[in-house]
Amino acid sequence: MCETMDFFERYKNLKEKYEEKKTKPKVIVVGRSNVGKSTFVRLMTGRKDIRVGKKPGVTLKINEYDMGEYILVDMPGFGYMAGLPKKVQEKIKDEIVHYIEEHADEIAAAVQIIDTKSFFEIVERWKGRGEIPIDLEMFDFITDLKISPILVANKMDKIKKEEWDAVLDGICEYLKCQPPWHQWKFIVPAILKEGKGIEEIKKKILERVRLFKKLRGIE
């Protein structure tokens, strides 16, 4: 949650551990299925062979891409995945959690992508069942591990422009971050299918990667 995000202190405390093991930091990409993760990875890497589909669950394994200063890690989408038994979906979710826990000390940032249009409906549906909404659970999980988040509010084209601030403020409230959203530098509104927001995301990634490396003495 926002009130506990002391990422600078985490970076500083881990510097000694990285005196000998000077590996490239990782930047993970997480989100529910069908929120635009594959589109984001294509924009970041320039690779055209990354599948982008309308059916949830196109990415079913963890893929790593060397971005020069860091490794971009594309995680499978969590939640509903088309054509997969629930047992398999749960197994994939467990693998995501295990990977993040196992590599937490190597992760400079986590890019969490949400579908802004459906976010509120899905969160309320899960809460109505007495369950923790999976988007909120993932955000809490990332920040509890003191991993610096970058929350990409994708598909903003489906929101009226005059409603953007109110919608993003509402997301802040669900994340237990006091509005207005502008004060939280980790939130980036985006329309990834049009490439809008990608440069701001790249900038935030590099800021976190370079701080991460500086505090660990990684060249």
Curated annotation (Swiss-Prot):
Which molecular function terms from Gene Ontology are attached? Answer: GTP binding; metal ion binding
Q: Does the keyword Nucleotidyltransferase apply?
A: no
Q: Cross-referenced PROSITE patterns, in alphabetical order?
A: G_ENGB
Note the SUPFAM superfamilies from the entry: P-loop containing nucleoside triphosphate hydrolases
Q: Where does Mg(2+) bind?
A: 38, 59
- Residues the record lists as binding GTP: 31-38, 57-61, 74-77, 154-157, 189-191
| Residue ranges of every copy of the EngB-type G domain listed in the record | 23-211
Q: Which GO terms describe its biological process?
A: cell division
Task: Identify the cofactor(s).
Answer: Mg(2+)
Kindly give the InterPro entries that the UniProt entry links to this protein: G_ENGB_dom, GTP-bd, GTP-bd_ribosome_bio_YsxC, P-loop_NTPase
Keywords attached to this entry: Cell cycle, Cell division, GTP-binding, Magnesium, Metal-binding, Nucleotide-binding, Septation
Q: Which residues span the membrane?
A: none
Q: Which domain of life is it from?
A: Archaea
- The answer to whether UniProt assigns keyword Cell division to this entry is yes
Query: Could you tell me what this protein does?
Result: Necessary for normal cell division and for the maintenance of normal septation.
Family under the similarity heading: Belongs to the TRAFAC class TrmE-Era-EngA-EngB-Septin-like GTPase superfamily. EngB GTPase family.
Q: Which HAMAP family match?
A: GTPase_EngB
Q: By what name is this protein known?
A: Probable GTP-binding protein EngB
Protein source organism: Methanocaldococcus jannaschii (strain ATCC 43067 / DSM 2661 / JAL-1 / JCM 10045 / NBRC 100440) (Methanococcus jannaschii)
